[in-house]
Amino acid sequence: MKTLTFLLSTVIELYTMVVLLRVWMQWARCDFYNPFSQFVVKATQPIVGPLRRIIPAMGPIDSASLLVAFILCVIKAIVLFMVITFQPIIWISALLILLKTIGSLIFWVLLLMAIMSWVSQGRSPVEYVLMQLADPLLRPIRNLLPSMGGIDFSPMVLVLLLYVINMGVAEVLQATGNVLLPGMGMELRMPLKPAQDGRCRAR
């Protein structure tokens, strides 16, 4: 059962990231003729396309894709907590999972951008889209940071902010997990340290 739950939650999270990429690319006004952008659009169009005819966009935000991402997080929350009936806490957990997924997506985009800057050196179409995605987030930080002799520390600052936010979200997710089913929230955290684990078993 745990293996199936892990597989389902992983597949849902990966697809949620692809949907969020679509929202992010529209917000950042990325080149949608780029091969990578076309992949994201084609992968999400079967679900997002029909909703876009009903739900209008909110300025640069693709509200239909954002709604799909939230629904996927609701499903993931139900899978993680193994709850059949809808409880109010599920919606809170889904929102927190959505925020956590957004943070993870930003982190992986920054990491891939850093790796590809060494490997492809600007020749890859994927790197071009990653730079377009990251620029709206990094530009305000660059404006605040003083000049560091040509070294860009804005990605490090953003990763640090994401880490702090992720820690806070993880704490709240643990609390909501314990409210739903005692002990379930612990699955969302890191395992106990060996010394602590040993003391627990000794008791």
Model-derived regions: residue spans:
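Selective transmembrane helix interface/packing segments
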Residues: 1-203
